[in-house]
């Protein structure tokens, strides 16, 4: 359970190696009834983890439980309850819109073709891929192709969605609409539906994110409900005179000729006594970047 809340999906001792990279997750908990964001820099292991959870990869060690059951995703009834979108190669390039609709209906009992058509129309997906002379989906832009992927998965009757970078190819308006779609999906489930999505677009997706898992180098380095994380961390701002003294207390610090700002643990607020500083509630983006900076192997290059 997560903070006394039932889990939609759990994992234990999940391990997978690629050369020098190692995915190593002793425990994974995705709370039921919420939207959980998976955040981390490129190569952190987000896609690998999602592929394991979705049953795309089976060459891993450890155990995954779906809906409190010790079950494989291929077991009867489990696959039908899970919707998945990958970052690429979701459809064969020569498929038309009609073929996407037909094949989704053959693969999944809970696929609703009428709902699919309505979503496609609402999202203004290029209608030229439908009909007897429909074009191949490969003709769609990256944004429209992701819309089609989302229409397919949201047209199914599922209990959890596993979405790998669904916001990346989308424009700002469509990202906002995706957030609305996730909210509606959760609301229809009356607390029994869940969404687990990876994203680099933290600011755009923050409004729909209830719970957050931060990954770096194959490990979970922080997690929690967003409201709790915003109480755990604090944004500190101050004048340049206090920069060096404050830097010692900050997890990360950005300074210029006017002053500084950075993230600190809220429990350390009293250590800033005597400094001319202001405290603010940080955004999820600010918290995430601070934690990633703490754990990354990247270093700032010299820019001449």
Model region roles, listed by residue range:
Residues 161-165:
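Catalytic Walker B motif of ABC-type/P-loop ATPase nucleotide-binding domains
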Residues 39-41:
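The feature captures the beta-strand-to-loop junction immediately N-terminal to the Walker
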Residues 251-304:
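C-terminal coupling/interaction segments
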Residues 54:
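Helix-to-loop junction immediately C-terminal to a conserved catalytic motif
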Residues 1-27, 32-34:
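A short, flexible loop at the N-terminus of ABC-type nucleotide-binding domains that lies
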Residues 62-78:
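Conserved ABC transporter NBD signature motif
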Residues 86-148:
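ABC-family P-loop ATPase nucleotide-binding domains
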């Amino acid at each position: 359970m997560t903070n006394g809340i039932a889990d939609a999906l759990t994992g234990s001792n999940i391990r997978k190696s690629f050369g020098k990279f190692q995915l190593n997750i002793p425990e994974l908990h995705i709370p039921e009834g919420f939207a959980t964001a998976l955040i981390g820099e490129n190569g952190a292991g987000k896609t690998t983890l999602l592929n394991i959870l979705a049953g795309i990869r089976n060459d891993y060690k450890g155990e995954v439980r779906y809906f409190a059951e010790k079950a494989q995703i291929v077991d009867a009834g489990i696959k039908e309850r899970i919707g998945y979108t990958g970052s690429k190669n979701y459809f064969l390039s020569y498929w038309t819109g009609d073929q996407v609709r037909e094949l989704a209906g053959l693969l999944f009992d809970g696929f609703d073709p009428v709902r699919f058509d309505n979503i496609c129309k609402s999202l203004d997906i290029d209608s030229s891929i439908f009909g007897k002379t429909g074009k191949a989906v490969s003709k769609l832009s990256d944004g429209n192709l992701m819309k089609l992927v989302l229409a397919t998965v949201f047209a199914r009757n599922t209990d959890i969605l596993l979405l790998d970078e669904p916001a990346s190819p989308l424009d700002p308006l469509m990202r906002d609409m995706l957030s609305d779609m996730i909210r509606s999906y959760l609301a229809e489930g009356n607390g029994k539906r869940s969404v687990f999505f990876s994203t680099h677009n933290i600011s755009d997706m923050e409004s729909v994110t209830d719970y957050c898992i931060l990954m770096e180098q194959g490990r979970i380095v922080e997690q929690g409900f967003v409201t709790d994380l915003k109480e755990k961390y604090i944004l500190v701002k101050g004048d340049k005179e206090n920069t060096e003294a404050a830097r010692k207390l900050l997890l990360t610090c950005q300074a210029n000729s006017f002053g500084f700002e950075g993230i600190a643990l809220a429990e350390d607020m009293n250590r800033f006594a005597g400094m001319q500083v202001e405290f603010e509630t940080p955004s999820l983006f600010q918290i995430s970047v601070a934690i990633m900076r703490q754990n990354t192997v990247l270093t700032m290059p010299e820019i001449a």
